[in-house]
Curated annotation (Swiss-Prot):
<dbReference type="InterPro" id="IPR033747">
    <property type="entry name" value="PurE_ClassI"/>
</dbReference>
<feature type="binding site">
    <location>
        <position position="15"/>
    </location>
    <ligand>
        <name>substrate</name>
    </ligand>
</feature>
<comment type="similarity">
    <text>Belongs to the AIR carboxylase family. Class I subfamily.</text>
</comment>
<feature type="binding site">
    <location>
        <position position="45"/>
    </location>
    <ligand>
        <name>substrate</name>
    </ligand>
</feature>
<comment type="function">
    <text>Catalyzes the conversion of N5-carboxyaminoimidazole ribonucleotide (N5-CAIR) to 4-carboxy-5-aminoimidazole ribonucleotide (CAIR).</text>
</comment>
<dbReference type="InterPro" id="IPR024694">
    <property type="entry name" value="PurE_prokaryotes"/>
</dbReference>
<protein>
    <recommendedName>
        <fullName>N5-carboxyaminoimidazole ribonucleotide mutase</fullName>
        <ecNumber>5.4.99.18</ecNumber>
    </recommendedName>
</protein>
<dbReference type="GO" id="GO:0006189">
    <property type="term" value="P:'de novo' IMP biosynthetic process"/>
</dbReference>
<dbReference type="InterPro" id="IPR000031">
    <property type="entry name" value="PurE_dom"/>
</dbReference>
<comment type="pathway">
    <text>Purine metabolism; IMP biosynthesis via de novo pathway; 5-amino-1-(5-phospho-D-ribosyl)imidazole-4-carboxylate from 5-amino-1-(5-phospho-D-ribosyl)imidazole (N5-CAIR route): step 2/2.</text>
</comment>
<dbReference type="GO" id="GO:0034023">
    <property type="term" value="F:5-(carboxyamino)imidazole ribonucleotide mutase activity"/>
</dbReference>
<keyword id="KW-0658">Purine biosynthesis</keyword>
<keyword id="KW-0413">Isomerase</keyword>
<feature type="binding site">
    <location>
        <position position="18"/>
    </location>
    <ligand>
        <name>substrate</name>
    </ligand>
</feature>
<dbReference type="Pfam" id="PF00731">
    <property type="entry name" value="AIRC"/>
</dbReference>
Length: 174
């Protein structure tokens, strides 16, 4: 996204192989017209860069960080340790344990260093959670979130009505 103003959300991933998952967070933020920055920063391979990112995030206007990582998945926890900005961890599905290793690495933080954690490959929900955090300060985001939820409700009600009218067999056929 072209940065119009200062970014509000940082989307960080440990590897470019995480991009197919993490792009879903970017899509949501774009739909809500919220500025973001997206970077690949490895907690293990580029620790100095990660420290610099965390140290300067607030002065760059970052208010929430979404951090996706697979495997050992230390990125979200290290970021949370280095900054007071809320960090939302996205466990990325791995080959070895289908993302369970990532989930447990992110969710099991020591007391005093919390990381909000979404489901495996849950970048879309991470972005929605980031928007909810921002909506405390930005009423225009809160209004867009209300509309988003109303639209979801309407779609479910439409599907239910269609199912009731057609029956399950015809519903599944078309």
């Amino acid at each position: 996204m072209v940065k119009v103003g200062m970014p509000k959300v940082g989307i960080i991933m440990g590897s470019d192989s995480d991009l197919p998952v993490m792009k879903e967070a970017a899509k949501v933020l774009e739909d809500f017209e919220v500025d973001y920055e997206m970077k690949v920063i490895s907690a293990h391979r580029t620790p100095e860069r990660l420290h610099e990112y965390a140290r300067t995030a607030e002065e760059r206007g970052i208010e929430v960080i979404i951090a996706g990582a697979g495997g050992a998945a230390h990125l979200p926890g290290v970021l949370a340790a280095l900054t007071m900005i809320p960090v939302i961890g996205v466990p990325i599905k791995s080959k070895a344990l289908n993302g369970l290793d990532s989930l447990l690495s992110i969710v099991q933080m020591p007391p005093g260093i919390p990381v909000a954690t979404v489901g495996i490959d849950g970048a879309k929900n991470a972005a929605l959670l980031a928007l909810e955090i921002l909506s405390i300060k930005y009423p225009e985001i809160k209004e867009k979130l209300k509309k988003y939820r109303e639209d979801m409700k309407r779609k479910v009600e439409e599907k239910s009505k269609k199912l009731e009218e057609l029956g399950w067999r015809k519903y599944l056929e078309g």
